[in-house]
C-alpha cells in the first residue's frame, strides 16, 4: 500500500500544473500521505512521500503552537526535521477524512478526526488524544505553499 501511495504521489506531483489540478483529489491524496506519516510503523519514505506534495518554501501554522506561517527557503526541510522528531511516536493511530472543500484553484481544506496513543519523544510521557482538525492548504503551481491547521 505504501509503495502504491509513493507511486501515485510521485506521478501526481510530476504531472500536474496549477491550472489542471483536481483539488478534491489532491486533498484526498494529501490526507492519505499525511496519515501514512503518523502510522506506528511509518518510515522516512512515508515522510518523503508526503513532503513531495509541498513547495520547498512551504509555510506552516498550527495554532496556538506555531503562529508564524512565513514561507522560508528551507520550509520543507524544517518540516521534515520536525516530522522526523515525532516519527514512531504513536503506538496507535487512526484518522477519518470528514470533508474536503475546494476554493477555485487556490486552496483546498480537509477536515478530519484523528485518534492517537503513544509516548511523547521529548517528555517520555504517555499521550492519548482524539481531535477534529481542519487544514487549509493554499496552493501554488500544483503544490502546497502554506498550511494552516486549526482544531475544532
Predicted regions and their residues:
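Sec-dependent N-terminal signal peptides
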Residues: 4-13
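Short, low-complexity N-terminal intrinsically disordered segments enriched in polar/charged residues
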Residues: 12, 16-53
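A solvent-exposed, acidic/Ser-Thr-rich amphipathic alpha-helical stretch
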Residues: 21-23, 48-103
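Hydrophobic pocket/interface hotspot
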Residues: 30, 50, 58, 79, ...
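Short, cysteine-centered beta-strand-loop-beta hairpins and adjacent loop/turn segments enriched
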Residues: 85-92, 116-128
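Short, surface-exposed coil-to-beta transition loops
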Residues: 93-96, 128-134
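A short hydrophobic beta-strand element
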Residues: 104-116
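Short beta-strand edge/turn micro-motifs at domain boundaries
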Residues: 107, 130-152
